[in-house]
Amino acid sequence: NVTARMRSPYVKVFEEERELTVVLLVDVSRSRLFGTVGTSRKDMLAEIAAVLSFSAIINNDKVGALFFSDKVEKFIPPKKGRSHLLHIIREIIEFEPSSDGTDISEALRYLTNAIKKKCAAFLLSDMLDVNKDGSPRYEEALKVAVNRHDLSVIEVFDPRERSIPNVG
């Protein structure tokens, strides 16, 4: 016994190695091009996605991406590796959607169907997907996705949207 030989408690520390799957759900609708203070939402989305992706790669996790507008535009299956990560970031910067609208429910449904095992998912959006009365259209799909995956919502907005400037 090591503790008896050393005459002090011997503690062995193990670090859990787990391979998470990280999926970025990126809103590529027309509204992402808006921006008044320095950068557009598109630039902010790319920066946030890059930070999350690099963090995942450092932890040896798989990273995938799902681009959506009012439909799923593109799905990049989760993989490991720096070249895969750079491919995702390049796609976020250069991708041109075929539709203008936003349907968060469609993206969440696709996520729950495409990724069977529990994953860490990040929804990067301006969350401008509401009914005429202002209620979110994605509420039910969000509940289903949260039950299956660890879902974090990162709302990207322009400061001008929160406070309308007094122009007279």
Predicted regions and their residues:
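Von Willebrand factor
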Residues: 84-119, 131-132, 158
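An amphipathic, basic-hydrophobic helix/alpha-beta surface used to engage anionic
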Residues: 1-78, 120, 125, 132, ...
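Short, conserved clusters of charged catalytic residues that mark active-site
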Residues: 48, 103-106, 136-137
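Von Willebrand factor type A / integrin I
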Residues: 113-117, 131-168
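A general boundary/transition motif marking the beginning of the first structured unit of a protein
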Residues: 77-80, 99
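Non-catalytic regulatory/linker segments of enzymes
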Residues: 63, 83-84
